[in-house]
Amino acid sequence: MRRKLVVGNWKMNGNLAQNKRLLEALVRGLQDVEHVDIAVCVPYPYLFQAQKILSGTNIAWGAQNVAKHENGAYTGEVSAAMLKEFGASYVIVGHSERSDAYCESNANIAEKFAIAKHYGITPIFCVGETLQERESGVMEYAIANQLDAVLSVSGGALLDQAVIAYEPVWAIGTNRTATPEQARAAHSFIRERIAAMHPGAAESVRIIYGGSVNPRNAAQLLSMPDIDGGLIGRCSLDADDFERICRAAC
């Protein structure tokens, strides 16, 4: 049975004082949660702070992006080896906000996925469709293209200990949320697509949902078949909200 995973994506938020209060509140509030894996993905400058506060707790930490290169003349980039030095367990790759703003291709995202795996960091690989793609009836085609880019480069073996996050782009940072049935159908399609190419990986890979999850809808969403947890944006910045979502996943 797949263990649930709840990941907070802080995006470009926080400062040292706010982070300290939030992280310490999460440590206190979640210390008795035993049956859910919990992580926060913080901005690069705060990795050391997260490492310092969260070490020895039941909360892991990670980053929101990684370079596809190991090292070299890539100004502004941060390598997987650097993330590993700060104890990062997870890294988000392919989030729609980055793909849109920085024109990241599926091939580029696949390289980031592979290098994270090479350094022992669990990639959280985001896939999803725009509202136009959903309304045009090509949702599955759009998701399949994103999945196939990684599967063709990495193969099924690299899905071991990886995470896929289904994030309907039209629900990111909005008040719109996929219905539980819409989310379940998308997760089921993703698992079936993986099974068609790499049967051994399909049942073990965790597929989490990201799209305006909040304390009010978390229990219903996270109880659906094939939904193995959540990638939480706005509500991960509030300790009470994030704790309630984590407990809803139990």
Swiss-Prot record:
This is Triosephosphate isomerase. Substrate binds at residues 9-11, 173, 212. InterPro entries: Aldolase_TIM, TIM_sf, TrioseP_Isoase_bac/euk, Triosephosphate_isomerase, Triosephosphate_isomerase_AS. Homodimer. Its main location: cytoplasm. GO terms for biological process: gluconeogenesis; glyceraldehyde-3-phosphate biosynthetic process; glycerol catabolic process; glycolytic process. Keywords: Cytoplasm, Gluconeogenesis, Glycolysis, Isomerase.
